[in-house]
UniProtKB/Swiss-Prot annotation:
Protein name: Protein ECT2
Top-level division of the source organism's lineage: Eukaryota
Residues that bear Phosphothreonine: T359, T373, T444, T846
GO biological process: activation of GTPase activity; activation of protein kinase activity; bicellular tight junction assembly; cell differentiation; cell morphogenesis; cellular response to calcium ion; cellular response to hydrogen peroxide; cellular response to ionizing radiation
Record note on modification: Phosphorylated by PLK1 in vitro. Hyperphosphorylated during the G2 phase of the cell cycle. Phosphorylation at Thr-373 occurs during the G2/M phase, relieves its auto-inhibition status and stimulates its GEF activity. Phosphorylation at Thr-444 in G2/M phase is required for subsequent binding with PLK1 and Rho exchange activation. Dephosphorylated at the time of cytokinesis. Phosphorylation at Thr-359 is required for its transformation activity in cancer cells.
Cross-link (Glycyl lysine isopeptide (Lys-Gly) (interchain with G-Cter in SUMO2)): K611
Database matches in PANTHER family: PROTEIN ECT2 (PTHR16777:SF2)
Function: Guanine nucleotide exchange factor (GEF) that catalyzes the exchange of GDP for GTP. Promotes guanine nucleotide exchange on the Rho family members of small GTPases, like RHOA, RHOC, RAC1 and CDC42. Required for signal transduction pathways involved in the regulation of cytokinesis. Component of the centralspindlin complex that serves as a microtubule-dependent and Rho-mediated signaling required for the myosin contractile ring formation during the cell cycle cytokinesis. Regulates the translocation of RHOA from the central spindle to the equatorial region.
Alphabetical UniProt keywords: Acetylation, Cell cycle, Cell division, Cell junction, Cytoplasm, Cytoskeleton, Differentiation, Guanine-nucleotide releasing factor, Isopeptide bond, Neurogenesis, Nucleus, Phosphoprotein, Protein transport, Proto-oncogene, Repeat, Tight junction, Transport, Ubl conjugation
Domain named DH: residues: 452-641
Native organism taxonomy: Eukaryota, Metazoa, Chordata, Craniata, Vertebrata
Low complexity bias (residue ranges): 856-870
Length: 913
């Protein structure tokens, strides 16, 4: 912390400088006398002074402060040393520096200013700890040029193990340490003095001029030179409330006023003090922009109102203004509106002033030409191409006609024409990544007689060139700017959001750049015998590698764009600015990103057309067939991956919906088969009457109940990406644990009921789980057959029918009577409350005789169909003796199993991974 400077002085002395005296001397030094000097000799002669802390009034009564002071051993002290500058000259230099001095003297308490004279001694370097910077004692100490700090400084130094800092001004806390502030737009001197004082008390520094060293500009208006400089430098522009709110939090340890979460709340919005009006926009666009104006701190009025400060004009539709604007009114293009939102500050109007176009037709044609021709410095050639462009009737744009804004929201994969159906020539957009848009060969040798094969090959090259330029536009105008560091106003999107939106677009671009170059060489050196199929066979593996990740997640990419556009105004403005550029053809990012989805089918059609116009004796005939086959394999691979992706997405949806769902549910080999809504009929897996959802997977069954109370959250609704979990995890059961599926007969007291006979590996008894189906979409018979089939597949048995057993409800004491009655619901509520109070669980036993009969059936009826009702009595008698050596299937041991149902992982499910 050494800071050296010099000042003429009459003699060479060494002394300790009081903070205010030290600061005043430094301020009085002129630039003519100021030069640097070494401080290597500062420690040669140290003064005989002790460092001491004085606790003023309430500070001496706070035990936390006194305890913190015991851990602080060092204090920063200013030192001034005066010596001759050069031999033989009378001038002398004053050197200042900061040294660390050990605190050997214990702290002293001071209750009033009457004690100050006895404590103010030149033998001590005193630092006063004051809890209130507004009382009279503070003012008296400040007038006496004393070093003053607040309690937060002591606590922070003790926590971090740092010495007590030196400050030439009273320092209450360090929440604005290392911040350099500048002020603009304040007319009342009293308000400005108050703000400056608070900044100094929090450790901040004030600068008169706004330059690159200023970290924050505190503005009371959105005009002036300082404001424009801050905007150009990307300096955060803050409201005065930022300082006041930071001062309110002065006693919070480790609080920093510059953190984004706190600072962003007080940034000056782009349209503060602005009154906008909009001309030439559709009603939908105008309404959206008016809402955005209010969100960004501005207001709006009808066109022509004298109070308006800005008129936003849609330059593509407005040919003339309906009135003569006043000199105070800024008439700007819509790019100013979106640019201000994107940079999170009011942009300079001079760069976006609206100008009436005298010859819009010519201007449009020239702009189109500038996109489609190589850069050239020859005026004659440019003029010739311009005239040729004006004489053409076809539009050179590779994009289809602009859709209505409302159509963008209903965009789907099959809703747009492929790019290959529209272009007539190759279009270049200037510099692109890796020089992708380098000019094509200006003259392509045309055969004397253009064959049909050559025409199709040329069309294939032209569409490939246009497609590469579309990919280059996506990367150059959208992805690269979003990924750039040091964006004005901070990053527009998070890195994971950018990755989700663009995915493997750069990889797809690299592959098609190579294909385009090979096709360009083939067209430039055309020969009927040259193979086009070899080009696509050459890059078939690359296409398989790059396309599935993007196509499979296109819908997710589209959803991410829509979500971010709604939640992040800067991203919405960013898209609007780029969409208006000619490179995009006035198409949205979603419309551009659908091109890779459409490209491979389009190429396959062109290759088929090329094969039709290729002679049988041409070697390329068979090569084209292989190339078409390779493209079909890529598309098949995409479809298979998409199905897998959708299956995995379904599992993720279950994990998000079920609170406490086991992590081992996520597995690459697992897929969701069926979801069934039921009601529990027994005491297990949860209380009778509870709504239970069964998720059947190909190898396990997830059991979850409806949450009684949804988890609350303190997060903003705008930040929530998905609804809270509506279900609570009970148990994840491998299908191998299901020994029997019981189809309960339909009676007056029992409807749509079924049960599962389960044998957990950690238990020595069987468990009966009974349910009533509540969903009408899936018949009970279909559900039970589906369940039995997957259980049989899991245990590697072919006879799935033998897993099902038809039973009477009385045999297992199962009934659905009065499940929805008011009395039944009240009884269940009382029972549940009683369980919570007593912390006890009561388990009703399933009749042993019925369970013995069911278990005997599973052992003795291998390879036979379930017994009919007529033979049920005989079956019961014959099965009794066979169960003599089998432990009783009583549910006495159920508590040890189902009391663990709320655990996320259990020993019975860990092998599912």
């Amino acid at each position: 912390m050494a800071d050296d400077s010099v000042l003429p002085s009459p003699s060479e002395i060494t002394s300790l400088a009081d903070s205010s005296v030290f600061d005043s001397k430094v301020a009085e030094m002129s630039k003519e006398n100021l030069c640097l000097a070494s401080t290597s000799n500062v420690d040669e002669e140290m003064p005989q002074v002790e460092a001491r802390v004085i606790m003023v009034q309430d500070a001496g009564k706070q035990e936390e402060l006194l305890k913190a002071l015991k851990t602080i051993k060092i204090m920063e002290v200013p030192v001034i040393k005066i010596k001759e500058s050069c031999p033989g000259k009378s001038e002398e230099k004053l050197i200042k520096s900061i040294i660390n001095m050990e605190m050997k003297v214990p702290c002293v308490k001071m209750d009033s200013m009457e004690e100050f004279e006895s404590l103010d001694s030149p033998e001590f370097e005193n630092i006063f700890v004051v809890t209130d910077f507004q009382n009279s004692v503070f003012n008296d100490l400040y007038k006496a040029d004393c070093r003053i700090v607040g309690p937060p400084v002591i606590l922070n130094c003790a926590q971090r193990g740092e010495p007590l800092p030196f400050s030439c001004r009273p320092l209450y806390c360090t929440s604005m340490l290392n911040l350099v502030l500048c002020f603009t737009g304040f007319r009342k001197k009293e308000e400005l003095v108050k703000l400056v004082t608070l900044v100094h008390h929090m450790g901040g520094v004030i600068r008169k001029e706004c330059n690159s060293k200023v970290t924050h500009l505190v503005a009371n208006c959105t005009q002036g030179e300082k404001f424009r400089v801050a905007v150009s430098l990307g300096t955060p522009i803050m409201k005065p409330e930022w300082i006041y709110k930071a001062w309110e939090r002065r006693n919070e340890q480790c609080f920093c006023a510059a953190v984004d979460d706190f600072r962003n709340e007080f940034k000056v919005p782009p349209f503060q003090d602005c009154i906008l009006s909009f001309l030439g926009f559709s009603d939908e666009e105008k309404h959206s922009m008016e809402e955005m104006t209010e969100m960004q701190g501005g207001s709006y009025l009808p066109v022509g109102d004298e109070r308006c400060t800005h008129l936003i004009v849609e330059e593509n539709t407005v040919k003339d203004l309906p009135f003569e604007p006043s000199k105070k009114l800024f008439v700007v293009k819509q790019e100013w509106f979106w640019g201000s939102i994107q940079m999170d500050a009011r942009a300079g109007e001079t760069m976006y002033l609206y100008e009436k176009a005298n010859t819009p037709e010519l201007k449009k044609s020239v702009s189109l030409l500038s996109l489609s021709t190589p850069n050239s410095n020859r005026k004659r050639r440019r003029l010739k191409e311009t005239l040729a462009q004006l004489s053409r009737e076809t539009d050179l744009s590779p994009f289809p006609p602009r859709k209505r804004p409302s159509a963008e929201h209903s965009l789907s994969i099959g809703s747009l024409l492929d790019i290959s159906n529209t272009p007539e020539s190759s279009i270049h957009y200037g510099e692109t990544p890796k020089s992708c848009a380098k000019s094509s060969r200006s003259s392509t040798p045309v055969p004397p007689k253009q064959s049909a094969r050559w025409q199709v090959a040329k069309e294939l090259y032209q569409t490939e060139s246009n497609y590469v330029n579309i990919l280059a536009t996506i990367i150059q105008l959208f992805q690269v700017p979003l990924e750039e560091e040091g964006q004005r106003g901070g990053p527009i999107l998070a890195p994971e959001e950018i990755k989700t939106i663009f995915g493997s677009i750069p990889d797809i671009f690299d592959v098609h750049m190579k294909i385009k170059d090979d096709l360009e060489d083939l067209i430039a050196n055309w020969d009927e015998s040259r193979s086009i199929g070899d080009i696509f066979l050459k890059y078939a593996k690359d296409l398989v590698k790059t396309y599935p990740p993007f196509v499979n997640f296109f819908e997710m990419s589209k959803e991410m764009i829509i979500k971010c556009e709604k939640q992040k105004p800067r991203f919405h403005a960013f898209l609007k600015i780029n969409q208006a550029k000619p490179e995009c053809g006035r198409q949205s990012l979603v419309e551009l990103l659908i091109r890779p989805v459409q490209r491979l089918p389009s190429v396959a059609l062109l290759l088929n057309d090329l094969k039709k116009h290729t002679a049988d004796e041409n070697p390329d005939k068979s090569t084209l067939e292989k190339a078409i086959g390779s493209l079909k394999e890529v598309m098949t691979h995409i479809n298979e991956d998409k199905r897998k992706t959708e299956a995995q997405k379904q599992i993720f949806d279950v994990v998000y919906e079920v609170d406490g769902c086991p992590a081992n549910l996520l597995s690459s080999h697992r897929s969701l088969v069926q979801r069934v809504e039921t009601v529990s009929l027994g005491e297990h897996p949860c209380d009778r009457g509870e709504q239970v959802t069964l998720f059947l997977f190909n190898d396990c069954l997830e059991i979850a109940r409806k949450r009684h109370k949804v988890i609350g959250t303190f997060r903003s609704p705008h930040d929530r990406t998905r609804p809270p979990a509506s279900l609570k995890h009970i148990h994840l059961m491998p299908l191998s644990q299901i020994k029997k599926v019981l189809d309960i007969r339909e009676t007056e007291d029992c409807h749509n009921a079924f049960a599962l006979l389960v044998r957990p590996p950690t238990e020595q008894a069987n468990v009966l789980l009974s349910f009533q189906m509540t969903s009408e979409e899936l018949p009970k018979e279909s559900w039970l057959k589906m369940l039995c089939r997957h259980v049989a597949n899991t245990i590697c048995k072919a006879d799935a029918e033998n897993l099902m057993y038809v039973a009477d409800p009385e045999s297992f004491e199962v009934n659905t009577k009065d499940m929805d009655s008011t009395l039944s619901r009240a009884s269940r509520a009382i029972k549940k409350t009683s369980k919570k109070v007593t912390r006890a669980f009561s388990f009703s036993k399933t009749p042993k005789r019925a369970l013995r009969m069911a278990l005997s059936s599973s052992h003795s009826s291998e390879g036979r169909s379930p017994p009919s009702s007529g033979k049920l009595a005989v079956s019961r008698l014959s099965s009794t003796s066979s169960l003599a050596g089998i432990p009783s299937p009583s549910l006495v041991s159920l508590p040890s199993f189902f009391e663990r149902r709320s655990h996320t992982l259990s020993r019975s499910t860990t092998h599912l991974i």
